[in-house]
Design a protein with these regions (language model features):
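Active-site environment of divalent metal-dependent phosphoester hydrolases
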Residues: 134, 183-185, 280-282
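Short active-site oxyanion
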Residues: 92-94, 172-176
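Short, glycine/polar-rich helix-capping loops at beta-to-alpha or helix-loop-helix junctions
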Residues: 182-193
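Active-site metal-binding loops of divalent metal-dependent hydrolases
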Residues: 13, 100-101, 129, 180-181, ...
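Active-site histidine-anchored catalytic micro-motif
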Residues: 89, 93-164, 267-268
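Short, structured patches in soluble enzyme cores that scaffold and shape functional sites
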Residues: 126-129, 153, 174, 179-182, ...
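Internal, well-ordered alpha-helical segments in soluble enzyme and binding-protein domains
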Residues: 129, 133, 145-148, 171, ...
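Catalytic cores of soluble, metal-dependent hydrolases
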Residues: 2-13, 19-95, 107, 114-117, ...
Length: 305
């Protein structure tokens, strides 16, 4: 039996969001028992650390109002990309703990570098209430956590689109969203132009989660050789995950999210993952972080029976 190896990469970065607190997300997830859960699942934890250091002075000036805190985000995400690429090169599963969703710039760049040199089609499962498909021209806030996926597809500031290596990181036609329910006008138009696939909460209400889940699995089996899962806890209804950066009503239930992770695990396509925007400042008895651990476990092969 092949040994299962995992590298847990903590990214306590919240420069990409207007509401701070997600920098404490990795600690909350660790305290919720992630290490023990991974060992119970038979994983060899080859690394569990934080590769970045945040200087408090970096909070004093956000710089470009169209892409706030661009420089510290770039620096951190380049480091993350290196960590992710190194892990997959060594047949180690990189699990990234955010932090806000701007860290996806680094995660996706790292797994993309691996995919390109191994001639693999990279797919992205983007489980998020939001599109994160703004650019510096369309963003109403200038917060980079709302621009990260567009940049990974080649849209936006060159500082972001060319992060880690020059050029597009993922074909937008290989991206599938689940649980979307809040899009800005500009990003909606860009998403349509780019050709991403979106299964919104309206689709889930209209057709039922089971039917949508089947479509998600079919999508990745036909569009990808490897998949990166990018899971933002705000996709969940605040009833189940109150401790997120931007809680929105009418989201996924915990059961739906857990089943999605379990079904993705069964595809044997998932090569890397991140879970982001756990905000302990807004949480209740750490329940959001506890649920994050359960979601990670299902994605990594945990079964009820």
């Amino acid at each position: 039996m092949k040994e299962k190896k995992i590298s847990v990469i903590e990214m306590p970065l919240d420069f990409g969001a207007s509401r701070h607190g997600s920098d404490m997300g990795p600690s909350a997830i660790r305290l919720a028992g992630l290490g023990n859960k991974l060992e119970d699942l038979g994983y060899d934890i080859v690394k569990y650390d934080c590769p970045i250091q945040i200087n408090p002075k970096e909070y004093e000036d956000f710089g470009n109002p169209k892409a706030k805190f661009l420089e510290p985000i770039k620096k951190s995400c380049i480091t993350l990309a290196e960590e992710v690429e190194q892990a997959v090169d060594n047949d180690v599963f990189p699990l990234v703990l955010g932090g806000d969703h701007s860290i996806a710039l680094g995660s996706i760049a790292g797994i993309s570098a691996y995919a390109k040199k191994n001639n693999k089609r990279l797919g992205i499962l983007y489980v998020d209430a939001h599109g994160d498909f703004n650019t510096d021209e369309t963003s109403p806030t200038g917060n980079i956590h709302g621009e990260c996926l567009a940049a990974s597809c080649g849209y936006g500031l060159p500082d972001l689109t060319n992060l880690y290596f020059e050029g597009t990181k993922v074909n937008p036609k290989n991206i599938c969203y689940v649980g979307t329910r809040d899009l800005d006008n500009g990003e909606r138009e860009l998403m349509k132009k780019a050709g991403v696939t979106v299964f919104s909460m309206s689709d889930i209400e209209r057709h039922g989660f089971a039917a949508i889940l089947k479509k998600v699995i079919v999508f990745f089996k036909s569009h990808a050789d490897i998949v990166h899962v990018s899971f933002d806890m705000d996709v969940l209804d605040p009833m189940f995950a109150p401790g997120t950066v931007i809680p929105l009503p009418a989201g996924l239930t915990n059961r739906e999210a857990l089943l999605l992770m379990e079904e993705m695990a069964d595809t044997n396509l998932v090569k890397s993952a991140e879970i982001v925007e756990v905000n302990p400042v807004l949480d209740v008895r750490n329940q959001t972080a506890i649920l994050a651990v359960s979601l990670i476990a299902r994605l990594l092969g945990e079964k009820i029976y």
